[in-house]
Amino acid sequence: MKAYINRTATFAWSPATYESDSPLIATGTVAGALDESFSNESLLELWKPFYAASADANIDADAKPLASISTSARFNRLAWGYANPSRPKGLLAAGLENGELGIWDADKVLAAAAESDAQVIKNTTHTGPVRGLDFNPLQPNLLSSGAVAGEIFIWDLNSPAKPYSPGARSSKLDEITSLAWNCQVPHVLATSSSSGYTVVWDLRGKREVVALQYGGGAGTAVGSLGINAGSALAAGGRRGMSAVAWHPDTPTRLVTASEDDSSPVIMLWDLRNSRAPEKIMTGHDKGILSLSWCKQDADLLLSCGKDNRSICWNPQTCDIVGELPSSSNWSFEVQWSPRNPGMLATASFDGKIGVHSLQSTNAPEPDAPATQQLNEDSDFFNQATAPQTTSKGLSLKQPPKWLRRPVSAVFGFGGQLVSSGGPSSKPFTPTVHLRDFVSEPSIVERATKLQHALDGQSLAEFCAQRSQDPSTRPDDIANWKALQTLFRADSRDELVALLGFSKEDIAQKVSQSIAAFKTNGTAAVEPEVTPVTNPIDEPELTKPVTSADDGADAVEAANEIVEPAAIATEPAPEVEANDIDEPGLFGDDAAGAANNDASDFFNQISAGQTPAVRSALPSHLLSESQPHIHSSAATIGSPAPSSVASESIRPSTFKIYPSEESEADKLITRALVLGEFESAVSLCINSDRFADAFLLAVRGGEELLAKTQKAYFEKRTAQLPYLRLFQSIVSDDLTDVVQNADLGEWQEIFVVLCTFSKQDEFSNLTEQLGQRLEFQYSLARNSDITQAKEHRKNAVLCYLAAGKLEKVAGMWIDEMKEEELALRSNTKNADESHKGTLYSARAEALQTFMEKITVFQSAVGYVDVDLQQPTQDSIVAETGARSYKLAPLYDRIHEYVELLADQGLISPALRFANQTPADYRPHGPADQSATATALKQRLLKAEIARPKTDTAASSSTNNVVAAASASASSYAAAPASNGYAPYDPYGQSTSSSVPTVPSVPAVPAVNTYQDPYAAAAPSPSVAAPQPPTQSRYAPAVPAPVPTAMQPEPVQTNAYGAYGAQSYQSAYQPAQPMIPAAPAFGASSYGQQQHQQQLPPPPPLKRDQSGWNDVPEGLAAPKRTPSAMSQHKSANAITSPFPNAPAQAPSPYGGAPGAPPTGPPRGATPSRGMMSPPPQGPPSGPGLAQQRVGPPGVRPPPMGPAQGQPRPGQQQPGPPSQAAPSAGPYARPPAGPGAPSANGMQQQQQPGAPPVGPGAGALRPPGQALPGAPGLAGPPGVPQRSATPGGGAGAPSRSATPGARGASQMKYPPGDRSHIPENQRPIQHALQREVARLKATAPPAQKRMIDDTERRINLLLDHLNCGTIDAKTVGGLMQIVAAIEARNKQAALNIHLQLVTSSSGDVAAGLVGVKMIISRL
């Protein structure tokens, strides 16, 4: 209750046109009731309710009315209306109990005028109490009144002297209880009577239109039947109608209320079908006394009655939408406020008029207890009758129309905008619209371009575009150029060029410098040496050579004797060869002579003279035309003249020990003569003659050269700075350059690393350089912003070259913040209303950041090891306590995922979400710290619920994860460390159903299939190429399960990735000392030509797994294999001699240990070449095979016949010496725990080729798929026929059902571009889980994982071709969601539902899915 008036009175609200800050209420003392004062006085009062914040019982006890006038009689009805310029506050009309109609001027009443002055009309036309009174809402000057005996008068207040009658008095009316004007048609009036009728009048026609009556179960329109009110039918159905009200919007609808306590109903009538009420509302316990229909909202109807209740209804639905607190006595009147529909008032006989608000905020108080402890002196009757007031307000179940939004909208996850709206006539049946909402189209465009670049592997071009984009910040241009260089093979050279360094430029500058030296004569020339004039005495030449020790002493003595001035201490300058004067090579002229001047030759040429050309080489080596002059030097002491033509003895001949030679030179010469290079080098070094030292050290060996270099660097590094750098380069100690070189020359340091560092050292060295630059950045960021940014840019370049994502991410985050601030600043300067663009600035900066991160990951192939090492501790995973080195990057990825999702890019968002650990919890507010798993689940749900659309935004995100995982390596394989649990075989029987097989394909098969159960294999680089898809009937993973539960899928070929043939086993046994099953890969040589000539095989019947299995007593005992012995136990017996060495591979492809392969193409095996029976009963699985194995089938003349064994069959006995080749389609060995196959499971079919008697040979291989690798398996051992001649009539197996599925595929295997966008989560989740299995599975189970991968690829092939039904796709989506959530049980339940209704390739693929689920 908002307010109340202490009066037992009828009331009326001031009209809507009344101008006041708050509405007024007029009250008139009600007739037939007494108040607390027991006064007989009748008052007309005007009130302004005090709207208190609380409804305490005494808050309005002393409230006084604004005006009060005494009247001659009490009031039955009070109405307030007809406000006009002459009477702005309107007129107050009252129906009194004495039959008088009184009308007062409200303005005069408020002015406290005398009663005679305030009353406008006082009419006594009515003969009885006036209980009906209403102003016409469309013509306010008309006032209707009703009294006893069906009296109805219409008053024109402009001339109220004489009233008008609506027509002839109706016989169906007695006392008029209520009347109401139609809200849409001004001349229609409805009147209700105590007789039980409600009559509708047409005042224009002055006639009764219709009379409505409620007869107990339905209303009755009796006006047209001429039934009188006093008739039996009418008398039996009389129930007084206490109130009537018109629909505020529809002129043909109205409601009536019954005051009968036995049938307190409200009837909704439609005059177009007036024979029965349209609806009946029940809820009151006793008769209803008043109705009020809200003019502003037709869905709100008030009623009150004898049960002390005031109820708010929705007449459209007949529901109670609210109820006021009950009064302690009858509530006899209720009205909506005309001006403020949120206010309403009720009057009751408990002496209060309550004013209520629909927006009351008062908290409800607890109800008083039913019984209270009474004091001894208390008055029982006073307490029993005390009014109980509560503060409980009216609370509606539905919003009123003026508060109801005509259109509502809300943003949904995934860029969805949900809006609802509808016509005002049907507010509760609105139309719901679901729209894609893109608030940042530039982000969508850029994200789409990024995805296109990833899909098209054109990220280098993407970098070039970003670096040339005018919108790119200058700081980012260097980043994009550096990123572009990382995609090139010679990225180091590109980085060097990016910094402005060029070898060509250096070479050009050196050439220019040399030319300048020549022109200016500034090149230093070695001092001329005085020529030898006196020969050395002969005794000097004949001196005995000292020993090594003596020579060392002599060297030391020379070091002491030689004066420093006599030894060149300055380094010899580098000069051109043309500038060096060597007089000993140009005749006997002394050095420095006039004709020996270095420029004399050129001077003679310029003077036109032609001097005699003399060569630096001896003339006897130039020409034989000169006269033979024998060299005296060559012939002295010779028994015969020398045969070598020589010039005569010239002064150019030299002495080994010239006289003017220093003692140090003599010692060097002596050491050289003896080959003592180390001593000579030592003397040269001590004499600072490093050029001579290096020449001698080169002849002395690498060790001496290294010592010479070290000594040279020690002495000369301080004088020549470039030697410090060269020393680091020569000694492979670039760490010294990185750590000690001045950072002002960081570019030179970086170029040195790019030029000289080793591949395995480059990353660490550039990281160290980046760390030095980053440290300078951290120091300068608070003082010199410009210098700090320069250091950061340089550090980013170093980290990019080093491939350190964790380093560069932090610095790019700083750049992102700066870019965001810059965008905000630009926005503020451009437009003051920038509040809505803060999100855009953040989005733009974040998009740039993620573009750089994505491109960088793809360029360097970054591997995030945290993704490969999931958290093992469940508590740590739940709390998010694990620390990650890329945590800041993960936070930005989560933010970017939400940004993409907000723009409707669900698939790209899901791909980026997968680049964070599953248990990572972003840092931020609690409501935004959902783990990566929760975010993925939400994205998956949005992806599943999203309709299939081929929009540009969605099509551009087809292969985000595929590209990102291949390049960014978020899911790249990491070294495995965990064990591998035995495979749960649940769900393997799903592939037992086999469809009909088509005819033989015309395209030749290619045998590249790998045996998933073969022994350990070499690296994939040695093996045959992996096929992109797998056989849907590839061998199931073995497990220790009962025989009846084992599937019998038929193997077939998968598509070959390449067209090459496999001529030998793709995998060789890892341990030849152990009898191992030969791997798949038997020769396909000799098949490609004749396969096309074979007739179509007969159709294959469906096999029902387990219906005719071998009894468990005959089967070999099964054991659960261990991780170490699993590959051993799966090997079949391939030789009767266990200790025999493995055979070499057959030239036709037979695996080691396999029987001789079949003849080459064109050769026909002899009919007599049948396998002999085994020498002894084999043990183990072979025994069961021999007992129940199928009869052998002899191969046809043109190579292997059609057929395919089941993967669950064990290998039979030892091979024959002339058995046909196992071929690429022989069945694989049975795994540990696999059931013994029953030979009778294969149904007999007519049309088999004839066979000879005796033991049967291997089952012939089946037809290969076009371009598919064959199922190269180990050769089978011949089986003993169960009956003589049992091989006769055995049918050849037709081509596998996989051939039919493959031939019908619209797109080639491995293609994933046609997978619908809403099904992309299936592809990426399965590929990601397969990558996880490959990374974590031990090597012993590699073939099992490969088999799972082939099954998944086959399933994805069908998904790409659109051959999987919608129900299965939906189930796969649910499985993917469960896998992402790591909900193993839910995934198993969904998988069970799928496998029970799937067959063919889908069933085979689901086996791979089951493998993934089992490893969660």
UniProtKB/Swiss-Prot annotation:
WD repeats lie at residues 8-48, 70-114, 125-165, 171-211, 236-279, 283-323, 326-366, 410-435. Pfam families: WD40. InterPro entries: SEC31-like, WD40/YVTN_repeat-like_dom_sf, WD40_repeat_dom_sf, WD40_rpt. It is a peripheral membrane protein. Residues 1122-1137 have a biased composition (Polar residues). Coiled coil: none annotated. One of its GO terms (molecular function) is structural molecule activity. GO terms for biological process: COPII-coated vesicle cargo loading; endoplasmic reticulum organization; protein transport. Keywords: Cytoplasmic vesicle, Endoplasmic reticulum, ER-Golgi transport, Membrane, Protein transport, Repeat, Transport, WD repeat. It is found in: Cytoplasmic vesicle, COPII-coated vesicle membrane; Endoplasmic reticulum membrane. The COPII coat is composed of at least 5 proteins: the SEC23/24 complex, the SEC13/31 complex, and the protein SAR1. SEC13 and SEC31 make a 2:2 tetramer that forms the edge element of the COPII outer coat. The tetramer self-assembles in multiple copies to form the complete polyhedral cage. Interacts (via WD 8) with SEC13. Belongs to the WD repeat SEC31 family. This is Protein transport protein SEC31. It comes from Mycosarcoma maydis (Corn smut fungus).
